[in-house]
């Protein structure tokens, strides 16, 4: 049996971060939205017992058991007693380690495919597996615009009109940011202050965009401020970093305005290792079979590191 789906990228239009908790995690309140940009994920289920394999053509460093997609398949097999071979093939379009959720989305795509292949209808169990794999994975089981709270596992659907974006991703190891680093920088910058998370709001406007991780990350990675300036200079109504970065993005009034800005910025950064993409937020990617996880799932998770 072979199944295929799209694993959409995401951006955090809003990311508010609380103080560290006793368990080492940070509580968040984040407005996450999927994009019309995504990876293609193929999952093949064999008839005989055997291993999980994972290949990412053109990106051999992503092959194998350490890929989140492979981990998701292994946890699915353990939870539901599956022994048959599972082959995963991922055609990557989402930049890697970019704050766009590519790895988490691939993992959720595999879970969606396997749930269909084996007729699994236990949504709570699937959400628990997703949370074991990573904090962002439950969001991608839907996925649709949602407020993510707790560690990211408590999801509340959100009304987000289509937003026309330009994504700017610096493909430079010197600008890479691990999520754990970003949270540590934020904690250090607060100097012991423990701010409360602001409430959710009913409808998104660009003026509400914001990311608590951005100020400390800009201090540690100053070139990101230059990229944000390019977006503002080309008419972005808001420009922020997505997640823990290093991708930054701007919102624009229309798809045409975003496309023009993307072309101009691409010309301005042609001599640098920078990827520029125009994208639009969606209520649901047409290539995704929906699977909404419950509001919460009680399960261990992986810490941000």
Swiss-Prot record:
Keywords of the record: ATP-binding, Isoprene biosynthesis, Kinase, Nucleotide-binding, Transferase
Enzyme's top EC category: transferase
Reaction equations catalysed: 4-CDP-2-C-methyl-D-erythritol + ATP = 4-CDP-2-C-methyl-D-erythritol 2-phosphate + ADP + H(+)
Spans annotated as Disordered: 286-305
Pathway(s) per entry: Isoprenoid biosynthesis; isopentenyl diphosphate biosynthesis via DXP pathway; isopentenyl diphosphate from 1-deoxy-D-xylulose 5-phosphate: step 3/6
Recorded GO MF terms: 4-(cytidine 5'-diphospho)-2-C-methyl-D-erythritol kinase activity; ATP binding
Binding residues for ATP: 95-105
InterPro entries to which the protein is assigned, alphabetical: GHMP_kinase_C_dom (IPR013750), GHMP_kinase_C_sf (IPR036554), GHMP_kinase_N_dom (IPR006204), IspE (IPR004424), Ribosomal_Su5_D2-typ_SF (IPR020568), Ribsml_uS5_D2-typ_fold_subgr (IPR014721)
EC number assigned by the record: 2.7.1.148
Key word ATP-binding present: yes
Biased composition (Low complexity): 290-305
Pfam families: GHMP_kinases_C, GHMP_kinases_N
SUPFAM superfamilies named in the record: GHMP Kinase, C-terminal domain, Ribosomal protein S5 domain 2-like
GO BP: any one term: terpenoid biosynthetic process
Family membership noted in the UniProt record: Belongs to the GHMP kinase family. IspE subfamily.
Annotated function: Catalyzes the phosphorylation of the position 2 hydroxy group of 4-diphosphocytidyl-2C-methyl-D-erythritol.
Protein's UniProt name: 4-diphosphocytidyl-2-C-methyl-D-erythritol kinase
Gene: ispE
């Amino acid at each position: 049996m072979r199944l295929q789906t799209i694993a959409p990228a995401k951006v955090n239009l809003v990311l508010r971060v609380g103080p560290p908790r006793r368990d080492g995690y940070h509580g968040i309140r984040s407005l996450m939205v999927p994009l019309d940009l995504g990876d293609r994920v193929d999952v093949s289920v064999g008839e005989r017992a055997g291993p999980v394999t994972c290949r990412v053509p053109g990106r051999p460093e992503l092959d194998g058991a350490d890929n989140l997609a492979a981990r998701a398949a292994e946890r699915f097999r353990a939870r539901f007693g599956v022994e048959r071979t599972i082959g995963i093939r991922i055609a990557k379009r989402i930049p890697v380690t970019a704050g766009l959720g590519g790895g988490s989305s691939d993992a959720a795509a595999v879970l969606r495919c396997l749930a269909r292949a084996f007729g699994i209808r236990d949504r709570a169990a699937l959400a628990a597996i997703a949370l074991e794999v990573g904090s962002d994975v439950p969001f991608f089981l839907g996925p649709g615009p949602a407020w993510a709270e707790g560690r990211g596992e408590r999801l509340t659907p959100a009304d987000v009109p289509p937003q026309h974006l330009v994504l700017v991703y610096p493909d430079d190891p010197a600008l890479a940011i691990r999520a754990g680093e970003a949270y540590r920088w934020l904690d250090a910058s607060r100097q012991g202050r423990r701010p409360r998370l602001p409430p959710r709001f009913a409808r998104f406007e660009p003026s509400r965009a914001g990311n608590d991780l951005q100020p400390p990350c800009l201090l540690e990675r100053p070139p990101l401020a230059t990229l944000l300036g390019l977006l503002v200079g080309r008419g972005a109504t808001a420009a922020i970093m997505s997640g823990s970065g290093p991708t930054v993005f701007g919102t624009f009034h229309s798809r045409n305005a975003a496309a023009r800005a993307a072309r101009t910025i691409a010309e301005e950064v042609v001599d640098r290792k920078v990827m520029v993409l125009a994208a639009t937020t969606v209520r649901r990617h047409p290539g995704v079979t929906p699977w909404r996880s419950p509001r919460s799932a009680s399960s261990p998770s992986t810490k941000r590191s």
